[in-house]
């Protein structure tokens, strides 16, 4: 019998990863805005993602819709436990989206919209990190009902992961701008990105050390045999790709810094999945316990398998059409 729950969790996991990468670098551009005061530089930065930024968020919608369709218990429980940070994240996304469009229309109030774009980008990343940290720490449930407090999500660890996601997005943004720009803006990114990579490596290390120490079940999953043998390449590869990303910046490579950062994101995400598997509401509810009826999963899976190739095609097409570098004075992006 086909395990529809496993198929759905793979779809959702891949969708979330694509969202983190695609929306990560365009959120990173807003996070990097304070490093640049000139309007021309900021225009170029925004133009690198103007044709694709709203499409990038499609993957967040796909992940949320997938949870609702295939794992309704997760949707209701996680939403109840993380209601406030999710709402604040959505508000920040709205501010950022409005600022993105209004900044080019209202020259008189451009400074205000710049600040809204910066604030919306930083807060979106921060609250996504808060949600991640709270999820890793676990969600208190009894018979499928959330039984924790309204502020259980707010802990030093979740704040730290919030900062970590902001740094992650800024690093992706640096890599994207190195690839998509040239001249002075690109040179500045070569200076900023190594600092971001080092900060990101430190954050990855702290989270990797804290998580197994605070959660014995996660430590057992990583450090018992044969898992230890299978998973030991993950931290080694993190070291390797961190070094290669730093070297690529020093050698002024254009695509490599972004690709090595992408590899670090995939490795960190892999570690996250390994730590929690098979629990979808950590630390007690597995994907099979939280699953919708098979008939519901099958019906929605058919729709997803029809829709996902279309999303992939138009996403790939938009990136292909706007594949060239963006320079000062380029028009047609708005």
Regions picked out by a protein language model, each given a short descriptive name:
Residues 1-12, 66-83, 136-156:
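Helix-coil boundary and interhelical linker segments in multi-pass alpha-helical membrane proteins
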Residues 2-5, 32-33, 37-50, 287-289, ...:
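Extramembrane terminal tails and long inter-domain/linker segments of multi-pass membrane proteins
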Residues 8-19, 79-91, 118-123, 152-166, ...:
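Alpha-helical transmembrane segments
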Residues 258-266:
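Central hydrophobic cores of alpha-helical transmembrane segments
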Residues 1-55, 61-64:
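N-terminal signal-anchor module of multipass membrane proteins
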Residues 52-122, 142, 220-229:
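Membrane-interface helix-loop-helix modules in multi-pass inner-membrane proteins
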Residues 102-253:
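Long, contiguous internal "core" modules enriched in hydrophobic/ aromatic residues
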Residues 281-300:
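Short, membrane-exposed interhelical loops at transmembrane-helix boundaries
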């Amino acid at each position: 019998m086909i395990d529809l729950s496993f198929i759905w969790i793979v779809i959702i996991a891949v969708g979330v990863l694509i969202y983190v990468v695609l929306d990560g670098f365009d959120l990173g551009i807003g996070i990097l805005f304070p490093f640049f005061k000139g309007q021309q530089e900021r225009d170029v930065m925004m133009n690198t993602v103007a044709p694709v930024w709203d499409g990038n968020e499609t993957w967040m919608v796909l992940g949320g819709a997938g949870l609702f369709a295939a794992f309704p218990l997760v949707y209701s429980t996680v939403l109840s436990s993380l209601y406030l940070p999710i709402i604040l994240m959505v508000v920040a996304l709205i501010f950022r989206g409005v600022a993105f469009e209004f900044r080019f229309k209202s020259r008189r109030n451009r400074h205000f919209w710049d600040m809204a774009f910066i604030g919306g980008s930083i807060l979106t990343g921060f609250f996504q990190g808060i949600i991640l940290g709270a999820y890793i720490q676990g969600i208190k449930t009894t018979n499928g009902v959330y039984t924790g407090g309204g502020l259980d999500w707010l802990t030093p660890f979740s704040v730290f992961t919030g900062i970590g996601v902001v740094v992650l997005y800024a690093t992706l943004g640096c890599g994207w701008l190195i690839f998509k720009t040239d001249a002075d803006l690109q040179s500045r990114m070569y200076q900023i990105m190594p600092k971001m990579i080092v900060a990101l490596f430190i954050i990855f290390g702290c989270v990797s050390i804290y998580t197994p120490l605070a959660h014995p079940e996660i430590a057992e999953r990583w450090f018992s045999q044969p898992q230890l043998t299978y998973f030991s390449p993950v931290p080694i590869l993190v070291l390797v790709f961190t070094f290669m990303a730093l070297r690529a910046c020093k050698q002024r490579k254009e695509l490599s810094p972004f690709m090595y950062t992408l590899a670090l994101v995939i490795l960190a995400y892999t570690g996250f999945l390994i730590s929690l598997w098979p629990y979808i509401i950590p630390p007690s509810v597995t994907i099979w316990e939280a699953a919708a009826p098979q008939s519901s999963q099958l019906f929605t899976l058919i729709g997803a398998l029809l829709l996902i190739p279309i999303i992939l095609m138009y996403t790939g097409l938009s990136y292909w059409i706007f594949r060239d570098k963006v320079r000062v004075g380029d028009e047609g992006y708005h």
